[in-house]
Design a protein with these regions (language model features):
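Periplasmic c-type cytochrome electron-transfer domains
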Residues: 1-178
Length: 178
């Protein structure tokens, strides 16, 4: 039989934060295409000036500078270092980035802007909307400041850890594909 895991109170609080105040669920959405690898693309405000322009280098469009694939969060506890360049070694550092370290940027994905979620939802429903759209006539988009408390950050991390299947670290069939 399958052992079902019941979330603790702390993990449930983290799950609620994931989909509300922390806004994680606006980008890290459940798979829709079944591929399991990436969910979309976004500029998450890592840099103001880019040593790696991401999709912008492939497209030739400066509006896409700083845009990278958004991975799903399956087994997130096992996939450090984090971000396209490995700049964060812990989930705490990632949470801190989203909590107060997002840099203002004209290409910042709207989900991380200081717009409220209702405004974001209404903009995303427009036929011509793109999450990498330069807003405000090219002015820098101000990032959200989540304001997560120490307790909320701990709850969010606790939930993120539930997305990891520890069985793959113990079961020999997953150890060496060659």
């Amino acid at each position: 039989g399958i052992d079902l895991y019941e979330l603790s109170l702390l993990e449930k609080q983290g799950m609620k934060l994931f989909y509300t105040k922390a806004r994680c669920g606006t980008c890290h959405k459940p798979e829709q295409n079944g591929s399991g690898y990436f969910t979309s693309f976004a500029n998450i405000g890592l840099d103001i000036n880019y040593s790696d322009p991401g999709v912008g280098s492939l497209s030739g469009s400066s509006n896409l500078n700083g845009v990278f694939k958004i991975p799903n969060l399956k087994n997130v506890a096992l996939t450090a270092p984090y971000m396209h360049d490995g700049r964060f070694s812990t989930l705490e550092q990632v949470i801190d980035h989203y909590n107060h370290g997002i840099k203002p940027n004209p290409n910042l994905s709207i989900e991380l802007s200081n717009l409220n979620l209702e405004t974001i939802d209404s903009l995303q429903n427009l036929p011509s909307f793109s999450t990498t759209l330069t807003m405000n006539g090219g002015l820098t988009i101000e990032p959200i400041k989540l304001g997560l408390s120490v307790e909320e950050k701990a709850a969010l991390k606790a939930f993120l850890l539930t997305l990891t299947d520890e069985e793959i670290t113990r079961d020999i069939k997953f150890s060496d594909p060659f």
